[in-house]
Structures are given as structure tokens and as C-alpha cells.
């Protein structure tokens, strides 16, 4: 055993002087943390669940990033509680697909990018890497805009300076990686808790109509017949699955030490990883519901503009719009939650970038360099817009709409292979998708891909 450890250490130390390293021939996804979290043997349910708790929160972050906020709040402001049913259905689809991604990683010992690359050419691997990297950068743009505006609102500094400050998260990430994977999970969980508590408090103050709120979780035909409502519903469903979250989920499910030759150990890992994923995605569902409920309780019927972060911030401090609960503290709490959302997504974006680079093009670079490169590529267009429009937040937020197009383009290249691989008896053995799971997943795939194509065409103006 000691000999194996020494060999691993010598391999880890060998490429220190190499900036780019080839990962061809390596099988482990995120090798530095793969199997690094020990799971107690023969422990009780709660102790075992605690050991598996963590990866799910990193996945859930993608479902409550700043890019989703405006759609949810605007949905409530325009159509009250009617679109809560769309959030519910979207969350159930997310739970299904993320559980499949985790199961794929646990059973095969490889992530989605690695398995896709094994079945495609080198050229196609590069193309898929570029498409998925573009999606990660698009998510990064949303984080930068959200974090930059939050910093400006909290500290009253120029937006350009706030955007530049967001690049400092490279240093934060380096520190977190040294602390260990469990510490990363705990810090992200803390940031998510801040978001959850802020919006729970603000919804409590807003005093929503509970009977109408719960009725909103039942779908109505208006969602399909009302064109404006349909467009917002498409926006919510279209953002259901972040493509890079599927790659991430298939990889970080392998951070727990599992004996893949032991059927019971694999089955246990699948069970508890799925529970963790569903619990954390339930939190994301609650946060997105709270955002829509807040929009409905405070802004429905007021004719207020709530399509921008700054509009929302100012409205929460305006008694003519939100009534007696308006206060500077309410606005500041919103900005704190916005900053927490942007920063919590930083870690998952970096890990996803490493996974797809190693999986698709068999290349590894230092995390700090990868994060810096991704962030600089994302910051550049935002900075150009910020300087050109003299720090006008409303103009800059238009980039959010454009960034969603990249996410929509990348989605089919992640979701179709995922369903195909997890439905393969050859790959998954006895853990292959059950019939109802397979058919449900294919229906969800067709719906999501179709909606994303529709959104792309609508965004670029091909259809009205």
C-alpha cells in the first residue's frame, strides 16, 4: 500500500516544471481529489449520508446563479404565482438528469467528457471542448456581472472597479484547493445558506398570499396559450440544466472512496449520492421559488421595472413600490445574496473547466492559470461594455441574454450522450437506466433541446 502511495506522489511531483501536461492514458477524473473523501464502513444512515453530502451543493449552485434571478423575479412580477409550476417541473427534470450523471461517474469511474471523448475523434473532442468551454465562459459572464454590480451597490465604487475585483477570486480558489475538497463544499454551502436565508426573510416580510402561492404549483393552460407567459416559462425551463453541471456531476460523484468491484458498495454510493443531489436541488428549487414569490408579492400589479439587478435593488428601498417593508437593509441584503451567488459559482466553473479540458483534449494546466484564463476571457467583453457604456448597468446586463445562447447551444452535446451512456447495458451493467427512467430522460431531452432551439431563434430574432 505504501509503495502505491509513493508512486502516486512521484507522479504528482514529476510535472511541476511543465505548464501543460498530457492526461492521455489517465483514467481518473479530477485526479487530485478522486476518492479523497473516506466513507465509514457499516455506519448508520445519517452518518453515511453526511459522508456523501457535499457534491450536491456544488451542483445546485448552477441552478441559482445570477443568470436565473431576473427570469424568476420577472415571472412573479408579471404573472404572480402562475409560473411556480414551471419551476417545480424544471427542478424534477434537473433531479433526474443529475442523478444519472452521478450514477455514470460512480459506476464507470469516468466522467461524461472522458466517455464522450473515447467514442469520438480527436478533432471532435476539440470541437466539443470549445463548445462546452464557451458555455462555462457564458456562465462566468453572468457571475461577473452579478458580482460586479453587487460590489458596486454594496460599496458604492465604480462598476469597472467592481468587475476587476471579481478576478481576485483566482486567489480565493487557490486557497480553497489547498484546504481540501470537504472545505470547498462547506464554504459553498455557507454561501448558499446566505442566499436562502436572505430570500426567506424578504419573502416573510413581503407577506405572500399563501393559498394563491400553493395553487401556483399546479400547471394551467394559460402557460401555453399566453405568449408572454410562455416566453418566460421557456426561459425558466431552458435554464433547467446547465450543460457543464452534467460534466461536473459525473466527476465529483467520484470524490468519495468507492470499491467499484463491490456491488453493494457501488449501490450504496449511488443511493446516498442521489439523496444528496436531490436534497441540494430541492434547496435550489426553494430559492428559485422564493425569487418568483418575492417578485409576485412585491411587484405584481405595480407596473415597476424589475428586469435589472439595479432596478430590483432600488425598488426594495422604495416605499411607493414595495410598501412599508422598504428599507436600505432590504436592498443591501439583496446585494449580499447577489454577491454570494456569483462567488459560489466560481468554484464550480473552474472545476468544470478542468474536467472538460482533461476529458476532451487530454490536457491539464495549473488551476490558477486555468481560472485566470477563463476569467480574463469572460471579463474582457464585460469590461469593454462597461467602459463603452460608461458603467451603465442596464446596458451591461444585456450581455446576460447573449450569454444564455451559448448555454443553449452546448446543452444537446451534454444531455444526449448522458442519456445514451446511462442507457447502455455494456457500460452500466446492472445499474443501467430502468425503462421508465430511460423514457422519461429521452422525453426531457427532446423537450429541453427543442425549447433551447426555440429560445436561440427568438433571441437572435429569427422568430417573434
Swiss-Prot record:
GO terms for biological process: iron ion transmembrane transport. One of its GO terms (cellular component) is plasma membrane. The keyword Transmembrane applies. Signal peptide: none annotated. Induction: In response to bitter compounds derived from hops. It is found in: Cell membrane. The chain crosses the membrane at residues 57-77, 82-102, 125-145, 157-177, 186-206, 229-249, 281-301, 321-341, 376-396, 399-419, 443-463. The keyword Ion transport applies. PANTHER family: NATURAL RESISTANCE-ASSOCIATED MACROPHAGE PROTEIN 2, SOLUTE CARRIER PROTEIN FAMILY 11 MEMBER. HAMAP family: NRAMP. Belongs to the NRAMP family. H(+)-stimulated, divalent metal cation uptake system. This is Divalent metal cation transporter MntH.
Amino acid at each position: 500500500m505504501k509503495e502505491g502511495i509513493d508512486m502516486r506522489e512521484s507522479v504528482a511531483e514529476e510535472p511541476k516544471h511543465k505548464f501543460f501536461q498530457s492526461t492521455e492514458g489517465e483514467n481518473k477524473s479530477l485526479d487530485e481529489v478522486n476518492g479523497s473523501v473516506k466513507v465509514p464502513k457499516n455506519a448508520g444512515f445519517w452518518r453515511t449520508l453526511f459522508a456523501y453530502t457535499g457534491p450536491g451543493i456544488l451542483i445546485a449552485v448552477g441552478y441559482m446563479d445570477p443568470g436565473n434571478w431576473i427570469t424568476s423575479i420577472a415571472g412573479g412580477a408579471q404573472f404572480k404565482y402562475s409560473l411556480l409550476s414551471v419551476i417545480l417541473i424544471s427542478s424534477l427534470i434537473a433531479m433526474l438528469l443529475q442523478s444519472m450523471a452521478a450514477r455514470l461517474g460512480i459506476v464507470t469511474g469516468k466522467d461524461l467528457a472522458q466517455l464522450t471523448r473515447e467514442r469520438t475523434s480527436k478533432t471532435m473532442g476539440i470541437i466539443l471542448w470549445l463548445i462546452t468551454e464557451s458555455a462555462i465562459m457564458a456562465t462566468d459572464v453572468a457571475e461577473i456581472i452579478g458580482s460586479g454590480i453587487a460590489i458596486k451597490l454594496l460599496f458604492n465604487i465604480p462598476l469597472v472597479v467592481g468587475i476587476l475585483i471579481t478576478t481576485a477570486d483566482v486567489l480565493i480558489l487557490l486557497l480553497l484547493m489547498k484546504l481540501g475538497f470537504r472545505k470547498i463544499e462547506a464554504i459553498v454551502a455557507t454561501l448558499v445558506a446566505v442566499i436562502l436565508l436572505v430570500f426567506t426573510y424578504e419573502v416573510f416580510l413581503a407577506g405572500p398570499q399563501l393559498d394563491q402561492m400553493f395553487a401556483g404549483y399546479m400547471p394551467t393552460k394559460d402557460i401555453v396559450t399566453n405568449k408572454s407567459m410562455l416566453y418566460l416559462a421557456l426561459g425558466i425551463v431552458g435554464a433547467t440544466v446547465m450543460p457543464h453541471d452534467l460534466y461536473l456531476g459525473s466527476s465529483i460523484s467520484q470524490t468519495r472512496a468507492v470499491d467499484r468491484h463491490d456491488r453493494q458498495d457501488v449501490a450504496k454510493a449511488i443511493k446516498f449520492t442521489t439523496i444528496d443531489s436531490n436534497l441540494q436541488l430541492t434547496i435550489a428549487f426553494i430559492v428559485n421559488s422564493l425569487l418568483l414569490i418575492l417578485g409576485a408579492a412585491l411587484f405584481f400589479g405595480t407596473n415597476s421595472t424589475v428586469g435589472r439587478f439595479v432596478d430590483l435593488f432600488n425598488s426594495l428601498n422604495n416605499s411607493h413600490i414595495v410598501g412599508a417593508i422598504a428599507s436600505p437593509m432590504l436592498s443591501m441584503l439583496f446585494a449580499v445574496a447577489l454577491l454570494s451567488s456569483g462567488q459560489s459559482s466560481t468554484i464550480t466553473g473552474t472545476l468544470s473547466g478542468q474536467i472538460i479540458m482533461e476529458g476532451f483534449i487530454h490536457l491539464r494546466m495549473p488551476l490558477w492559470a486555468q481560472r485566470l484564463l477563463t476569467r480574463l476571457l469572460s471579463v474582457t467583453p464585460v469590461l469593454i461594455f462597461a467602459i463603452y457604456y460608461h458603467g451603465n448597468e442596464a446596458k451591461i446586463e444585456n450581455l446576460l441574454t447573449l450569454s444564455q445562447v451559448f448555454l443553449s447551444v452546448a446543452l444537446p452535446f451534454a444531455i444526449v450522450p448522458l442519456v445514451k451512456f446511462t442507457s447502455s447495458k455494456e457500460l452500466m451493467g446492472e445499474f443501467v437506466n430502468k425503462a421508465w427512467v430511460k423514457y422519461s430522460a429521452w422525453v426531457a431531452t427532446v423537450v429541453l433541446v427543442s425549447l433551447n432551439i426555440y429560445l436561440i431563434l427568438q433571441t437572435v430574432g429569427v422568430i417573434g
